[in-house]
Amino acid sequence: MQILVDADACPVKDIITKNAKKYGIPVIMIIDTSHELNDGYSTVITVDKARDSVDIKLINMVQRGDIVVTQDYGVAAMGLGKGAKVLNQNGLIYSDANIDRLLFERHLGQKIRRAGGRTGTIRKRSKENDEAFEKALLLFIKPESEGPRDLKI
């Protein structure tokens, strides 16, 4: 198991690194050339700055049982298809039970925006978001003897 992170705009890199170190899990942070990253623990892979280049690299690397952190529903769907455990930066665990709905909602939002409409606002990140993310991440990485493993949505 390893943790692969779509790290370009990921606000929880420190939380990932802290917990991965604690449990001895390798972390791969994937960024494009417009970002710099060095946390002293993670392997950082830098790809060309092009549409979806980080996403494509991540999906090409993911294996069954890996953990993927992304806020991109398309990447989440492909990660699930490859047998990965996938979550976003707010602790939402993507699953076969919710990914179709999320992809459809994204599609509807794109149609509304193309027609000149608005679909909502982005809220400021909170401490509660960080706590929810860490709790969800630990569900994936803690050994079974250390805590509950029920990931039903």
Curated annotation (Swiss-Prot):
Query: InterPro entries recorded for this chain?
Result: UPF0178
Q: Which Pfam families match?
A: DUF188
Which residue pairs form cystines in this protein? none
Signal peptide range in chain numbering: none
Similarity comment: Belongs to the UPF0178 family.
Name this protein carries in UniProt = UPF0178 protein Ccel_2994
Species assigned in the record: Ruminiclostridium cellulolyticum (strain ATCC 35319 / DSM 5812 / JCM 6584 / H10)
